Curated annotation (Swiss-Prot):
InterPro entries: Beta-tubulin_BS, Beta_tubulin, Tub_FtsZ_C, Tubulin, Tubulin/FtsZ-like_C, Tubulin/FtsZ_2-layer-sand-dom, Tubulin/FtsZ_GTPase_sf, Tubulin_C
Cofactor entry: Mg(2+)
GO cellular component, one term: cytoplasmic microtubule
Organism domain of life: Eukaryota
An annotated Gene Ontology molecular function: GTPase activity
Protein's name according to its UniProt entry: Tubulin beta chain
Native organism taxonomy: Eukaryota, Fungi, Dikarya, Ascomycota, Taphrinomycotina
UniProt cross-references to SUPFAM superfamilies, sorted A to Z: Tubulin C-terminal domain-like, Tubulin nucleotide-binding domain-like
């Protein structure tokens, strides 16, 4: 079957990853040690997309856990799902990257990368038909950003024809974890533009907003944020893991979502967003799901789709949903909001259906949008980058690890190019219409 190899790097990547594995273990009826306790054959049918079957009826995640310091890995190992993972798949250094992209990409990370690739090869060789890789990491730190992008480029080199999907936590507008975040993020985007096939952008601030505004949680913690991310990750891969009427996989998703190779940065969303206790008090309908799914407030990245236009959209519905109803809803969204979709891609919404809902819900939908408004996010990081880079602030930490200023300049201009490409396609197609109007009047 179409296996996916999962990598999680750095503190953020490992925490999101741990949350993701607990979510999909539950969906497939596995307990915290990987023993199958489920009731339905459907849970077993495509278990091997993410799990290897081990002796004694245990299932082991095809997951590789990577960090440059042992702390986060110890936390995962001692957590509720610590016994799920294969012990050989924990690869960690001792020194840490100290939020320094250069350490993750060139010095500390480069020393560890070969032992990670050995584990990647071992996992890939055990697959029947490897579909691709997915990696969870953040772009603001040292390990997830620096070493994460190093791994992506190494895997790209070795498996050029396999899909590479990344779940990347991008820096937030107001909440900054580290001062050098803009540097790390810009250097990472520079890599992702070239080496990733699809990048799902997530940011903490948008997640906080959802937790507080929609879920009414008084003080959300990282556990709540990671829960939202894992819901989306589970939704995106649901068609691979369960039979459905309209199946999609990483490659089909990319073919439908990426009109130009560099523009593969997606905004994601999920519906229904209900707090843990309240979802039993309302019934869900497809129109409600669709409305919530397209609602700008529920996007998990801080860029407002109303400020741009959608190039393409994918909607993945789960549960007992009528195919016709979904098609009608999607059609009506495009009709009513046609100004928010580019007119030079006629049917730019792709739908997929899967008959098995997530745990505790009757139906759900996952939203993936390739919107030109994502440029806001890159623009914001770029402005912060150039403000610091103009003064060469903090640069010695990077040049001390052997980096050159030239690399910073290249990364900056690559990101500026990306922003202007998004701008160009946002207004493309409008110009021709203006000329047509003139002709009609004459």
């Amino acid at each position: 079957m179409r296996e996916i190899v999962h990598l999680q790097t750095g503190q953020c990547g490992n925490q999101i990853g741990a949350s993701f594995w607990s979510t999909i273990s539950g969906e497939h009826g596995l307990d915290s040690t990987g023993v199958y306790q489920g009731t339905s054959d459907l849970q077993l049918e495509r278990m091997n997309v993410y799990f290897n079957e081990a002796s004694g009826g245990k299932y082991v995640p095809r997951s590789i856990l990577i960090d440059l310091e042992p702390g986060t890995m110890d936390a995962v190992r001692s957590g509720p799902f610590g016994n799920l993972f294969r012990p050989d798949n924990f690869v960690f250094g001792q020194s840490g990257a100290g939020n320094n992209w250069a350490k993750g990409h060139y010095t500390e990370g480069a020393e560890l990368v070969d032992s990670v690739l050995d584990v990647v090869r071992r996992e890939a060789e055990a697959c029947d038909c490897l579909q691709g890789f997915q990696i969870t990491h953040s772009l603001g730190g040292g390990t997830g950003a620096g070493m994460g992008t190093l791994l992506i480029s190494k895997i790209r080199e070795e498996y050029p024809d396999r899909m590479m999907a990344t779940f990347s936590v991008v820096p937030s507008p107001k909440v900054s974890d580290t001062v050098v975040e803009p540097y790390n993020a810009t250097l990472s985007v520079h890599q992702l533009v070239e080496n990733s096939d699809e990048t799902f952008c997530i940011d903490n601030e948008a997640l906080y907003d959802i937790c507080m505004r929609t879920l009414k949680l008084p003080d959300p913690g990282y556990g709540d944020l990671n829960h939202l991310v894992s819901a989306v990750m589970s939704g995106i891969t649901t068609c691979l893991r369960f039979p459905g009427q309209l199946n999609s996989d990483l490659r089909k998703l990319a073919v439908n979502m990426v009109p130009f190779p560099r523009l593969h940065f997606f905004i994601v969303g999920f519906a229904p967003l209900t707090s843990k206790g309240s979802h039993s008090f309302r019934s869900l309908t497809v129109p409600e799901l669709t409305q919530q799914m397209f609602d700008a407030k529920n996007m998990m990245a801080a860029s407002d789709p109303r400020h741009g236009r959608y190039l393409t959209v994918a909607a993945i519905f789960r549960g007992r949903v009528s195919m016709k109803e979904v098609e009608d809803q999607m059609h009506s969204v495009q009709q009513k909001n046609s100004s928010y979709f580019v007119e030079w891609i006629p049917n730019n919404v792709q739908t997929a259906l899967c008959s098995i809902p997530p745990r505790g819900l009757k139906m759900s939908s996952t939203f993936i949008g390739n919107s030109t408004s994502i440029q806001e996010l890159f623009k914001r990081v770029g402005d912060q980058f150039s403000a610091m880079f103009r003064r060469k602030a903090f640069l010695h930490w990077y040049t001390g690890e052997g980096m050159d200023e030239m690399e910073f300049t290249e990364a900056e201009s690559n990101m500026n190019d990306l922003v202007s490409e998004y701008q160009q396609y946002e207004i493309a197609g409008v110009d021709e219409e203006v000329e047509l109007d003139d002709e009609i009047e004459t």
